[in-house]
């Protein structure tokens, strides 16, 4: 079935199918506009993509190419486009490049394809605004989101509008932006978790260390004796009777021993120097305690002669002076003698050490060398008797 036009072009089915198979993008995609208008619309659709449709795809699924619907063509435009295309086909002109229109209408893969070399550079944002402000011809759709997006100002859509890009490009950028916005938070969380792990490890180390220290202290306290334990007392030396008698005789002669005398006495008694020194210290303590008790008793009784017999003084007191003293003065003298006796004198030279004969006892001796019962009551001849 073939129809002839006024200009000699045929409208046969085989002619239309052959022209469709020859690679006309306008016929294949349902675009029946003239070739010049189709190219202009293609470049316009590439240069000025629908900003609102791209905005609607932010954070949602990529928009389907079906949303870019075409208005129903008018009958006279369809006839003109068919005649023009058939005339070009009979004149054996090379077919127009099908890469650019097909690329503009078909959905691209996820990765962005390179732009054709004949495409002009994308206009600046001012030109985009002016182009978008112009009335739309064939890129408008009747979807609810597109109709609602037409009322949005272009300024809100301009930051999201870029050059020719695939529908999947904007969600990738949005996902990258979201990932970059969450990256500092993730880094902060990672740093916090690392710090928490370090603190936990340090606390575990500290607890483990304190536990080990406690175990060491327990084991050391079990194995070794306590630090504040008293030193073991030395065993008391058991002296024999012979050793005690020799030590008592030596103490009656000398209350303080020199180093040489102590060593000689220790060698004679088969004792150590430390044992002899300890025995002398204990004996002097006992002697001073007994002397203090005796001085108190004699001072209370006022018997100064007995005090002189018990504790001879190196100083000579004339009997007349002793006879004129009362009991209070005698007690004071006894206290002075006691205090002088407790002063530890330096060890005299061994050659000078000899038993001193008490001078008071010599003067207190009676006729025949017998001690007088009351030496203060027997005055020396030629001295007045005190009354």
From Swiss-Prot:
It holds the Pfam family Homeodomain. Keywords: DNA-binding, Homeobox, Nucleus, Transcription, Transcription regulation. It is found in: Nucleus. GO terms for biological process: amacrine cell differentiation; cell fate determination; neuron migration; positive regulation of translation; regulation of axon extension; regulation of transcription by RNA polymerase II. Residues 114-126 have a biased composition (Pro residues). Residues 232-291 bind DNA. One of its GO terms (molecular function) is sequence-specific double-stranded DNA binding. Disulfide bonds: none annotated. Its main location: nucleus. Residues 1-145, 157-240, 367-387 are annotated as: Disordered. Residues 7-24, 160-178 have a biased composition (Polar residues). Coiled coil: none annotated. One of its GO terms (cellular component) is chromatin. Residues 100-113, 127-141 have a biased composition (Low complexity). Residues 180-220 have a biased composition (Basic and acidic residues). Belongs to the BAR homeobox family. Potential regulator of neural basic helix-loop-helix genes. This is BarH-like 2 homeobox protein. The lineage of its organism: Eukaryota, Metazoa, Chordata, Craniata, Vertebrata. The gene is BARHL2.
